[in-house]
Amino acid sequence: MAVKLNATKREDLTKSATKQIRLSGRVPAVVYGKAKDPKNVSVDSVDLVKTVRDEGRNAIISLQVENSSVDVMLHDYQIDPIKDELLHADFYVVNMSEEMDVNVAVRLDGETKGEKEGGVLQQPFYEILVRAKPNNIPEEIVIDVSDLDVGDSVSVADIKVDGNYEILEDPDTSVASVTPPTTEEDLDTDDVDENAEPELVGAENDSADEESENK
């Protein structure tokens, strides 16, 4: 079920008007989609953050614009890196009966056996691409890694799909692995490599020249 979010049309697109919108606690946004003319709106910043936090990044939002509503997903957003405030948002109009491709967060659950033995859990990807109808898009994909030993890994092919969606990534792609712990021997090797003096280019030739001159 889509969560409701109120929006207001934006007619004045000047910088000064946009600044006033942000000062009032709202976020300038654009609504667009396949065969849809873009519409400029604004939404309450707190309401948008709360919606994404409570419902997830891929939540279906019923955007209420005046006397009409449209089903959308938050496609992109911009944040002020200094003030940590929302600057802009993009909403993509979705067709509830059509499949779409979206990135879904991957969460590793549990402590691996390998970590208890000093191993290190590696997660090369934090999102994977899936295909599904809007209502079937999972909020996240949870992978139980508690049985992994040192040297074990989980690939896309190992993920149990619990729902009506398809994973589009290469089945052989690794999404989690446990690497061996770093040993003292590894550290000693690193120290030797770091302390080794670099070989001078041409040093061998210089020595050969000196020997020739001394003959």
Curated annotation (Swiss-Prot):
Organism of provenance: Oceanobacillus iheyensis (strain DSM 14371 / CIP 107618 / JCM 11309 / KCTC 3954 / HTE831)
Assembly: Part of the 50S ribosomal subunit; part of the 5S rRNA/L5/L18/L25 subcomplex. Contacts the 5S rRNA. Binds to the 5S rRNA independently of L5 and L18.
Gene Ontology BP terms: translation
UniProt keyword terms in alphabetical order: Ribonucleoprotein, Ribosomal protein, RNA-binding, rRNA-binding
Presence of the UniProt keyword Lyase in the record: no
Protein name: Large ribosomal subunit protein bL25
Cross-referenced Pfam families: Ribosomal_L25p, Ribosomal_TL5_C
Gene: rplY
Function text: This is one of the proteins that binds to the 5S RNA in the ribosome where it forms part of the central protuberance.
A GO MF label: structural constituent of ribosome
Keyword rRNA-binding in annotation: yes
GO cellular component, one term: cytosolic large ribosomal subunit
PANTHER family per UniProt: RIBOSOMAL PROTEIN L25/GLN-TRNA SYNTHETASE, ANTI-CODON-BINDING DOMAIN-CONTAINING PROTEIN, RIBOSOMAL PROTEIN L25_GLN-TRNA SYNTHETASE, ANTI-CODON-BINDING DOMAIN-CONTAINING PROTEIN
Family label: Belongs to the bacterial ribosomal protein bL25 family. CTC subfamily.
